[in-house]
């Protein structure tokens, strides 16, 4: 987008907002653990922290730009098209700063985005996930100020999809079709199909090789395909792309599956006319997944994964622990550690909030901890401090009897996705 009202970089105010960012999101405890080889021992409790976790540079950039925007346009109405990142603490801070969310009403309830509320005098922030081309066009016509915090890795996927489009290839996007990033990516392709996992990719490849029931195919993939998608026409030339937060290994397997499929269907000599691919998993996602694979090799009693419940990359971190057979719990903050007996967490399979009993073993314990790319160090530190508290361990390492205050009383919860 070329416009005097469009800003893709910061406003040179990072130094001015740095103190606020440090106070709200950083932690001296996390600095200590990093300096101590990502391990902290107190009393009979050992915490092993993944060597890559929490805020990635794309998230850091987006949050910093939002704070700079707040300072740059003081006195003007600021909007954001949806959550800037998938972390409740960060988004709540933005609300407290007076930034309004286009997908929320006055009471904070989720509603369809209402761009009619935006005036020419307003400022609209685009989140780290980006925005669809349709939303960009609406905002451009509003002639309002647009501050684009889209992660550069997401933009790289858009460039790849654009290349496929120009070559008249259908984009096969490994992702969740309702995720904000995938919605934005798909909007940049005339023809696309979103596959959630290797199983769905296999269904598509089986259709490419053997044909099948077109109506049944569209019934299954209808919500995940472009308007007018025709599997008999649109699966002849395909290019692989992905939501940047998906499991790297699965994206690679999906790419190889489509490559083998097109080679079988059209022959090795014609592969380039029918298949294109490029690695678009972001470095930060890969680093956190690699660190998680390393962490689960440690002798752990359990693992705590911290991140927003709608965070895709956090969910995939927990999948690694589950596949390894480790007791693991996805929480969004320290208040989910209700007591030494009870923990409230998001169940990986039901995607709902559940309560588990006897989650924290008695006696000596080793706890692995990691966090998704949208989780501030401060939240990680609060969780670690709560674990020590529940084990009766003070900052000095001394142990003693403690009470277990109930921080949350819900026995369960509604579906989270």
From Swiss-Prot:
Its EC number is 1.17.7.4. Its cofactor is [4Fe-4S] cluster. [4Fe-4S] cluster binds at residues 56, 151, 282. Belongs to the IspH family. Gene3D superfamilies: 3.40.50.11270, 4-hydroxy-3-methylbut-2-enyl diphosphate reductase, catalytic domain. Catalyzes the conversion of 1-hydroxy-2-methyl-2-(E)-butenyl 4-diphosphate (HMBPP) into a mixture of isopentenyl diphosphate (IPP) and dimethylallyl diphosphate (DMAPP). Acts in the terminal step of the DOXP/MEP pathway for isoprenoid precursor biosynthesis. It is an enzyme of class 1 (oxidoreductase). The keyword 4Fe-4S applies. This is 4-hydroxy-3-methylbut-2-enyl diphosphate reductase. It catalyses: isopentenyl diphosphate + 2 oxidized [2Fe-2S]-[ferredoxin] + H2O = (2E)-4-hydroxy-3-methylbut-2-enyl diphosphate + 2 reduced [2Fe-2S]-[ferredoxin] + 2 H(+); dimethylallyl diphosphate + 2 oxidized [2Fe-2S]-[ferredoxin] + H2O = (2E)-4-hydroxy-3-methylbut-2-enyl diphosphate + 2 reduced [2Fe-2S]-[ferredoxin] + 2 H(+). (2E)-4-hydroxy-3-methylbut-2-enyl diphosphate binds at residues 86, 179, 244, 311-313, 374. The active site is at residue 181. Signal peptide: none annotated. InterPro entries: LytB/IspH (IPR003451). GO terms for molecular function: 4 iron, 4 sulfur cluster binding; 4-hydroxy-3-methylbut-2-enyl diphosphate reductase activity; metal ion binding.
